[in-house]
């Protein structure tokens, strides 16, 4: 069928000599329905199947009908009957996740129906099999009519991906199936050569009031080549006006370079709350773009996405540079009450291209109501008053992976040194939700928070509440503490990378660290007394006071200089930033042993079962799963695993590199971090890179398997799950050389092949621990013997907490 004929059926008339526009193609793809004359009746004996990588789909019996062709190509079909889907991931992490969600390390599901879209040769493959099985198409209008609503509902979710291959000179075929499993319900099966991990299996599931996308497996096919980076954003020039109603009216010019030829579609991140008014090229010519097509604002908020897809008029050529201009409006500033406002869509308040390792230059001009103060990333060039507005100009002096701003009726305090300026901003009032908590005699406890302290006689100390605290009261001390943390971190990570650090308050229970700009929770600005009145437990108070602000400071190096490009590598920056925050807390309170306290908390957290599951947090999944750890089975999996186990992994590396008795026992660890922060500045740093750098710095004692390899460590502690449990049995005998200790070390809770070096200490009659030596545990039971001068009262496994484990 001629493509023009199809356009006439589904789109406004166009000239017979005109090429279809991107929107006409998209509308035509959306309008496709089943061709009633292309229906095939299948039986088991036909053995109809499709294989994509290591995924196998069998259509055993039922009906299969193709979508009507477009430009002579078939892009989909619908199947109803009985089929079987199989997948066999080889990666141990993916097997573990399959077992976590499905109860087995493979996909083995019977299904009843499937909606399938593709740009590969699936149609040709099926037609060949139909021909070999002597199957002929039949006319079945009833099947087509019954399927039309189903097809109409699902087409829009896939048509843009089909369109992308139509527009490309170098299409990367894909295959997608929405499958109705007998046991699992509806799930997705994707094989896409445009993705680094070509295979994806998963489904959306509800937990509580939230919907999560459970990724059962996502992995690369052996021998596959990752797709190249096609475009790179070089610089951003943005002019943003914050109107009196807090909405934005903004323009952005994004300067882009094509790294490869032949592509036309670019995908930008832009909040669904912002509406793109126009997208144009350098000459003002309009460019086609797609943003939550066919949805109104209310529909966008419920089922939209935060992406804007732009189509170039012609395929880009390698090394070609061009600028795309955007005009957009909407409201991403949230009102928390009591005059407290903050930026909600911090990642997508402007059209952002690329990932966390795509560094670019930024030039920001901001215009905002005169009564407010505004802070932003970059070096501040100037600020002026223009009527009822203030106008400020910021420009990056270092490459940035992202830009941000925040605003409010702030009080501020500054510290200026020879190398940097630290500005801390806070509201004079509390956000309404927190103010309500402080004004309540007994505020509802936050999750996992202890009951507020009560005074004798059963009267709550909140019975006569004092005046509400002001976050601004903490400005001076917080500025000093942040400056101290920077000085501390510079020893490990090198010079502070920015000239200015702006610290801004944000409602909620989290923090974020953008380049030169921190978003810090209001709780971190409160006194311990106010935190207690708000319902925070002692550990949460310590977290907001001693850890959260300084974790975000550490991100100035780890995340904003050393980047990550793949979700599997995000854990590294989070783990290093968090561990450095623990070290800083420990340095401020040496007698409190903060590092040990937090490591014990993290170990306990990893041992505790996830609510609604029989699994402990330590078995949710491996560190490289990143945000996949958040699922219907573990809504807070990322926080429960990344910060706790990630910190332990960095701690174990530090302990293995440590040189007790040296002038600087941490010299090797410091050298490792400094090498990484220099060598990988302003680019992506991966888990494989980390292993390589650790292997370059490793000591002979770390070489448990030979060959100067740390594969054993990364395979078990990074890509593995579980925490080893140890117990010892021993006996002693007296010899001329001293007391000989014979014993066995028992290792459980991990695979039989698990190997690690376990320090053993003798506890003598006086209660002191004396180091005997390290036992390399390479099986469930390992024998050992040591010689000591005094008979041990008992043997103790790792009392110095150098190893993530439990003991008896």
Would you name each region that the model predicts?
Residues 26, 31-139, 271-342, 388, ...:
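A surface-exposed beta-strand-loop module
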Residues 801-808:
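Edge beta-strands of extracellular beta-sandwich domains
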Residues 224-253, 257-264, 269-273, 353-550, ...:
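Hydrophobic helix-coil surface modules that form long, contiguous segments used
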Residues 264-266, 272-283, 706-710, 721-798:
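Beta-strand-rich binding/interaction modules
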Residues 488-490, 536-607, 643, 673:
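Zinc-dependent metallopeptidase catalytic helix centered on the HExxH motif
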């Amino acid at each position: 069928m001629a493509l023009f004929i199809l356009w006439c059926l589904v789109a406004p008339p166009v000239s017979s000599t005109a090429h279809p526009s991107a929107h006409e193609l998209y509308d035509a793809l959306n309008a496709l329905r089943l061709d009633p004359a292309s229906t095939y009746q299948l039986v088991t004996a036909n053995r109809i199947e499709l294989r994509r990588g290591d995924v196998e789909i069998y259509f055993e019996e039922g009906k299969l009908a193709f979508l009507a062709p477009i430009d002579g190509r078939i892009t989909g079909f619908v199947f109803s009957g009985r089929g079987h889907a199989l997948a066999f991931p080889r990666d141990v992490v993916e097997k573990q996740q399959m077992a976590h969600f499905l109860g087995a390390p493979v996909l083995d599901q019977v299904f009843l129906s499937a909606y399938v879209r593709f740009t590969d040769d699936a149609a040709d493959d099926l037609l060949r099999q139909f021909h070999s099985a002597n199957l002929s198409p039949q006319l079945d209008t009833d099947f087509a009519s019954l399927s039309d609503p189903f097809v109409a509902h699902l087409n829009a979710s896939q048509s843009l991906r089909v369109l992308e291959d139509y527009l490309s000179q170098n299409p990367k075929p894909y295959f997608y199936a929405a499958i109705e499993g007998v046991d699992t319900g509806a799930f997705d099966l994707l094989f896409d050569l445009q993705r680094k991990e070509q295979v994806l299996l998963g489904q959306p599931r509800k937990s509580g009031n939230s919907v999560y996308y459970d990724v059962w497996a996502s992995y690369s096919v052996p021998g596959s080549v990752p797709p190249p980076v096609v475009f790179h954003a070089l610089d951003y020039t943005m002019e943003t006006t914050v109107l009196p109603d807090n909405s934005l009216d903004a323009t952005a010019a994004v300067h882009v370079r094509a790294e490869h030829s032949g592509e036309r579609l670019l995908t930008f991140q832009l909040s669904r709350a912002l509406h793109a008014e126009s997208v144009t090229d350098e000459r003002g010519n309009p460019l086609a773009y797609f943003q939550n097509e066919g949805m109104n604002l209310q529909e966008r908020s419920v089922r939209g996405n935060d992406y804007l897809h732009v189509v170039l008029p012609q395929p880009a050529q390698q090394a070609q540079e061009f600028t795309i201009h955007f005009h957009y409006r909407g409201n991403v500033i949230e009102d928390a009450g009591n005059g407290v406002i903050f930026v909600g869509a911090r990642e997508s308040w402007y059209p952002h291209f690329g990932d966390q390792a795509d560094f670019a230059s930024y030039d920001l001009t901001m215009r905002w109501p005169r009564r407010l103060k505004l802070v932003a990333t970059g070096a501040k060039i100037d600020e002026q008053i223009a009527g009822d507005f203030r106008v400020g100009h910021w420009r990056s002096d270092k490459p940035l992976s992202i830009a941000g701003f925040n605003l409010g009726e702030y009080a501020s305090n500054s510290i200026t040194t020879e190398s940097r300026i630290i500005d801390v901003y806070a509201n004079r009032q509390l956000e309404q939700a927190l103010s309500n908590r402080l004004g309540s005699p007994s505020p509802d406890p936050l999750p996992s928070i202890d009951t507020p302290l009560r005074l004798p006689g059963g009267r709550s100390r909140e019975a006569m509440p004092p005046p509400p605290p002001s976050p601004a009261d903490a400005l001076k001390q917080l500025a000093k503490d942040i400056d101290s943390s920077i000085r501390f971190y510079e020893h490990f990570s090198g010079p502070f990378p920015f000239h200015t650090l702006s610290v801004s308050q944000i409602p909620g229970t989290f923090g974020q660290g953008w380049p030169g700009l921190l978003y810090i929770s209001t709780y971190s600005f409160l006194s311990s007394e106010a935190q207690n009145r708000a319902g925070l437990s002692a550990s949460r108070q310590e977290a907001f006071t001693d850890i959260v602000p300084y974790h975000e400071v550490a991100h100035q190096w780890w995340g904003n200089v050393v980047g990550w490009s793949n979700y599997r590598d995000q854990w590294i920056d989070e783990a290093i930033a968090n561990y450095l925050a623990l070290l800083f807390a420990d340095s401020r309170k040496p007698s409190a042993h903060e590092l040990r306290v937090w490591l014990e908390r993290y170990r306990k957290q990893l041992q505790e079962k996830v609510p609604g599951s029989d699994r402990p947090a330590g078995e949710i999944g491996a560190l490289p799963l990143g945000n996949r750890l958040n699922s219907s089975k573990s809504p807070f999996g990322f926080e429960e695993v990344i910060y706790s186990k990630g910190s332990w992994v960095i701690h174990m590396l530090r302990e293995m590199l440590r040189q007790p008795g040296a002038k600087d026992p941490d010299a090797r660890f410091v050298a490792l971090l400094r090498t990484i922060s220099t060598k990988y500045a302003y680019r992506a740093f991966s888990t494989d890179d980390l292993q390589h750098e650790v292997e370059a710095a490793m000591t002979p004692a770390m070489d448990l398997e030979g060959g100067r390899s740390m594969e054993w460590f990364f395979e078990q502690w990074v890509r593995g799950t579980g925490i080893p449990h140890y117990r010892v049995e021993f006996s002693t005998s007296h010899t001329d050389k001293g007391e000989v200790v014979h014993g066995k070390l028992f290792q459980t809770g991990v695979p039989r092949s698990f190997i690690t070096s376990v320090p053993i200490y003798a506890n003598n009659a006086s209660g002191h621990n004396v180091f005997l030596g390290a036992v390399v545990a390479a099986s469930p039971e390992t024998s050992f013997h040591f010689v000591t001068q005094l008979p041990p009262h008992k043997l103790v496994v790792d009392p110095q907490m150098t190893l993530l484990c439990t003991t008896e």
